[in-house]
């Protein structure tokens, strides 16, 4: 059987430019779908690109290609944002997004980026607050696109209104919100969504798997190391909890919660003494 953590490490343990975003995103799902045929889903992405190419002349303008991309994804195949069950973890697994033709902003954006790349459009992800977007830089102008809403092109006024809806008018649009994010940041955000879902549902085993992947992606992620220690503690895996807490204090000795973690280590030592 495939080792999901080894596969994920192989997918992400390289420079940004060498990461295959589609493959890496699919490997996230291996912990939940151990028999997942990643190459089969990559082939389905390739087929979507073939269908887009068939609808557009090779010399077509960028907006023609975007129109063809939107037609194939959102009209022909019916991809759409899952507003009815937004926090279903399936929305965060790219294989399920492809299978069910629905997802959340970041997974639909990954699919959009990957299909676009295969037809020659170099789209980038945007870590817009509360709602992941993509953009295409064209002749000094950014075309901002919302795959969750069927590939709508967003003006700055649209984006300002979106922030208003998301944050009640307390957050103003800033240029930094439109900066591109790297592939590892996209994967980190995908894992962050799953982390929040499993934490809220108290699914400790799946939460532990996501934290393991997050630490593979970013070995020095101190918050993830601390949080994994807390999950281990709740699972009564005391040696692993102690190891993570000690690593956290080595990496972040002056963190605001460092004293709390030290106290947890003292409590752990007492528990281990009682067990023995």
Where are these regions (language model features)?
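A structural boundary/capping signal
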Residues: 1-276
């Amino acid at each position: 059987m495939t080792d999901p953590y080894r596969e994920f490490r192989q997918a992400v343990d390289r420079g940004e430019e060498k990461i295959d975003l589609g493959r890496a995103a699919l490997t996230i799902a291996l912990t939940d779908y151990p028999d997942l045929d990643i190459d089969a889903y990559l082939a389905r992405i390739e087929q979507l690109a073939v269908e887009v190419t068939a609808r557009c002349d090779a010399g077509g303008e960028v907006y023609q290609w975007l129109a063809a991309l939107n037609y194939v994804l959102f009209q022909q195949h019916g991809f759409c944002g899952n507003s009815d069950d937004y926090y279903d973890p399936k929305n965060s697994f790219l294989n399920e997004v492809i299978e069910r033709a629905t997802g959340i902003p970041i997974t639909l954006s990954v699919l959009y980026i990957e299909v676009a790349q295969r037809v020659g459009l170099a789209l980038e992800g945007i870590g817009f607050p509360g709602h992941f977007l993509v953009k295409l830089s064209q002749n000094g102008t950014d075309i901002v696109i919302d795959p969750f809403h069927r590939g709508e092109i967003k003006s700055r006024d649209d984006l300002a209104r979106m922030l208003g809806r998301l944050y009640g008018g307390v957050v103003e649009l800033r240029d930094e919100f439109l900066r591109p994010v790297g592939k590892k940041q996209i994967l980190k955000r995908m894992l962050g969504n799953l982390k929040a879902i499993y934490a809220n549902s108290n699914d400790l085993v799946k939460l532990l798997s996501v934290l393991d992947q997050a630490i593979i992606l970013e070995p020095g992620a101190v918050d993830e190391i601390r949080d994994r220690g807390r999950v281990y503690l709740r699972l009564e895996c005391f040696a692993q909890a102690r190891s993570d807490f000690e690593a956290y204090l080595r990496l972040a000795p002056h963190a605001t919660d460092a004293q709390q973690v030290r106290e947890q280590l003292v409590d752990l030592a007492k528990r281990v003494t009682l067990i023995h």
